[in-house]
Amino acid sequence: MAIDMLSTFIKPMHREGKKFVAIFAGVTLLLFLIWEPLGWIGVLLTVWCYYFFRDPVRITPTREGLIVSPADGVVSLIEPAVPPAELGMGPEPMTRVSVFMSVFDCHVNRAPIGGTVTAVAYRPGKFLNASLDKASVDNERNALAIRLADGRQIAVVQIAGLVARRILCDVKEGTPLLTGERFGMIRFGSRLDVYLPEGVEPLVSIGQVMTSGETVLADLTSTEARRSGAAR
């Protein structure tokens, strides 16, 4: 029973977080030597740092054609938009679904669908609030184009936010990806944009809470109309 309870709270940690947790823990030890109350504040900050870099296992649906959320967070925008020019996907608008991640969300990013990475393009920029529409254009970003088995393409864009200062991407052109596979992360608050292929409608609504690698965002085989939702 105790082991089961611990497993509920203790999750695997992304490798990027190990150095930060080590630094926080070291500073905490020094704070205890200086003044015990400061040490306990350090403990809380160390625990928060571990929590931020958590990398829990996700159960990804494996049915062909499903597109899953690439990030934990809340759907902040659904609108037509031209994918980043640096990906070379053309000037035609695609349906863009934006998932905003707060500092309390898991920041590990996962592939929305299986395919082959055909382009990876980093572009420096500003650090505006990632929930703003113009963040897609103005902010620092890293964009991926993924070619699906049927030849269609999907774009995934990691966007730095007001607090985020580092985008990590572990894939390069030619990398094969499975649906839900980890491909990077963004540190300390950010956003993920997904550009859907033509004719594919999102099956989520603005304000909906998303779980990376699990929540179905769209279905390539579905003829269902775009969903709408309301807070209850």
Swiss-Prot record:
It is a peripheral membrane protein. Keywords: Cell membrane, Decarboxylase, Lipid biosynthesis, Lipid metabolism, Lyase, Membrane, Phospholipid biosynthesis, Phospholipid metabolism, Pyruvate, Zymogen. One of its GO terms (biological process) is phosphatidylethanolamine biosynthetic process. It is found in: Cell membrane. Pfam families: PS_Dcarbxylase. Pathway: Phospholipid metabolism; phosphatidylethanolamine biosynthesis; phosphatidylethanolamine from CDP-diacylglycerol: step 2/2. The active site is at S190 (schiff-base intermediate with substrate). It comes from the Bacteria. The record marks G189, S190 as: Cleavage (non-hydrolytic). The keyword Mitochondrion does not apply. It catalyses: a 1,2-diacyl-sn-glycero-3-phospho-L-serine + H(+) = a 1,2-diacyl-sn-glycero-3-phosphoethanolamine + CO2. Is synthesized initially as an inactive proenzyme. Formation of the active enzyme involves a self-maturation process in which the active site pyruvoyl group is generated from an internal serine residue via an autocatalytic post-translational modification. Two non-identical subunits are generated from the proenzyme in this reaction, and the pyruvate is formed at the N-terminus of the alpha chain, which is derived from the carboxyl end of the proenzyme. Its main location: membrane. Its EC number is 4.1.1.65. GO terms for cellular component: plasma membrane. Binds 1 pyruvoyl group covalently per subunit. One of its GO terms (molecular function) is phosphatidylserine decarboxylase activity. The modification Pyruvic acid (Ser) is found at S190. Its cofactor is pyruvate. HAMAP family: PS_decarb_PSD_A (MF_00664). Catalyzes the formation of phosphatidylethanolamine (PtdEtn) from phosphatidylserine (PtdSer). Heterodimer of a large membrane-associated beta subunit and a small pyruvoyl-containing alpha subunit. Belongs to the phosphatidylserine decarboxylase family. PSD-A subfamily. This is Phosphatidylserine decarboxylase proenzyme. The gene is psd.
